[in-house]
């Protein structure tokens, strides 16, 4: 009996220690990496300025506004739609901290889905964060999830019905921001975020919207621009200019029958020219090996080298991988 009590006390103590350590790690996911306002940022807004119901939630993301001295066109750049696609988020951070606008206005939302920044996809063994060395020291960044945190929106339905079109998708797509547009003011958390972004475009009459993404190397639409039909002429020009610089990039039309995505709904429901950009990210692929900080930053994975040799990929892939510098560079060039 005495041994059983001692064993029980030890097990309870160990359980508390494990719970404390795990809880501490989970609490870290609520911490946001710092974004330094560059000299080009002239003002800031919140998504709650366009939908007050988001105030005080993780969906009340910052909107950085960079306005030039001369009037001109306007563009919205979205990062963090899927926070497990780090090149998209890093591109917007670079723009916020370094871009200066002479003419027109640039709107930037680095954390389009702030809730998805606060957790990882379950059973994927993804890192919570990754670190980049800079001349000013190390900087860390969150590695999040493709979907809204269940703490903010739960449970998932068996079937997700897109409100504007009636299209039916898998139930977990209800937490995918890029299946929620144009959104609803009285909808789910994810639909409210989509609605606020749509209202931002409408009320400011933003001319162009660029949604930054990444895709796994085995995904057909990769290293490409996906454009609404009204945005095809300008997107074609961008593709030609990038090809002239020896940057291979494809151009895909937005499927009219696939609803909820930025390049479809924002083009249909607003006057903006809606486009989406994809780069190659091995850390979110299904064929990857160990998912760690090194894979996120270097894009090197021997499994994908083998997959390339047997023709299973839609992007060139060798021992050099596709590092974060290349992926961010593609977004910035586009």
Segments the model singles out, each with a brief description of its role:
Residues 92-97:
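Histidine-anchored nucleotide/phosphate-binding helix
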Residues 67-74:
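Proline/glycine-enriched tight loop/beta-turn segments at coil->beta junctions
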Residues 76-79:
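Short hydrophobic beta-strand that contains or immediately precedes a catalytic carboxylate
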Residues 69, 112-114, 280-282:
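Short, solvent-exposed coil/turn elements at secondary-structure transition points
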Residues 2-65, 98, 102, 189-208, ...:
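C-terminal accessory segments enriched in acidic
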Residues 81-83, 183, 281-285:
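A generic structural motif
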